[in-house]
């Protein structure tokens, strides 16, 4: 199934939404949109695209009402989700975790184009396997530019067949959070997370383990 979501935020106006397919957007506050699954997603064969545009002086918070469970489809194991974000204002993107079920293969790509005055907080959480499972695969690519200058190119793989797959031990869970400009990570984060200072006054927090922390 093809799913498309478009969210446009402008200063002094409620966000505008256009949605088709298995995801719908719901305005839950003047500056907050929650994504709601209206059908099982993502399934193998699904392609999900979310496009976000934020004008200068506007603020948008994007959440989801529940975790996304990536499942293998009848004809394909692969599903994909892409985020295209154009930000001149402020974006706080923190959807619920993605759970990749056994045998499913899910691919995430986030592309951000921001202006020098933009403010960004982007968090992604992933868990390979439901209870008792460990054979799913996930890959994530995050590309962020500020004023056409590269800020970050970040690629991660988890699960069976990934670059981190090893019989002696492999991570099955991930938290990744990008902030621009860099600020203190005052919200909950695992004690053993790593925070990297990036060029251009940005920061990237990453954590890997066996199970996502509760919180």
Where in this protein do the model-derived segments appear?
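Outer-membrane beta-barrel proteins
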Residues: 38-40, 98, 165
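A structural signal for small-residue-enriched, beta-sheet-centric alpha/beta enzyme cores
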Residues: 36, 124-215
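Internal, conserved structured core segments that host functional sites
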Residues: 75-132
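Glycine/small-residue-rich interface belts in oligomeric ring/scaffold proteins
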Residues: 2-83
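Residues on the solvent-exposed faces and adjacent turns
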Residues: 11, 54-56, 64, 87, ...
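A short, polar/proline- and glycine-enriched secondary-structure boundary/capping micro-motif
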Residues: 24-27, 71-76, 103-105, 131-135, ...
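Transmembrane beta-barrel architecture of outer membranes
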Residues: 45-49, 78-80, 105-109, 137-141
């Amino acid at each position: 199934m093809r799913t498309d979501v478009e969210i446009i935020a402008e200063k002094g106006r409620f966000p505008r939404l256009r949605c088709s397919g298995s995801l719908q957007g719901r305005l839950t506050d003047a500056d907050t949109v929650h994504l709601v699954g209206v059908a099982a997603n993502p399934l193998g064969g699904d392609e999900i695209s979310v496009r976000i545009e934020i004008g200068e002086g506007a603020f948008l918070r994007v959440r989801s009402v529940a975790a996304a469970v990536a499942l293998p489809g009848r004809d394909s194991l692969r599903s994909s989700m892409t985020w295209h974000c154009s930000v001149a204002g402020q974006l706080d993107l923190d959807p619920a975790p993605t759970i990749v079920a056994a045998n499913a293969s899910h691919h995430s790509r986030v592309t951000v184009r921001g202006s020098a005055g933009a403010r960004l907080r982007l968090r992604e959480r992933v868990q390979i396997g439901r209870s008792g499972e460990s054979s799913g695969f996930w890959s994530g690519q995050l590309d962020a530019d500020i004023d056409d200058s590269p800020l970050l190119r970040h690629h991660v793989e988890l699960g069976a067949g990934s670059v981190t797959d090893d019989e002696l031990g492999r991570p099955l869970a991930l938290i990744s959070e990008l902030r621009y400009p860099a600020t203190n990570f005052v919200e909950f984060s695992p004690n053993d997370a790593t925070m990297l200072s990036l060029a251009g006054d940005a920061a990237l927090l990453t954590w890997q383990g066996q199970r996502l922390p509760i919180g």
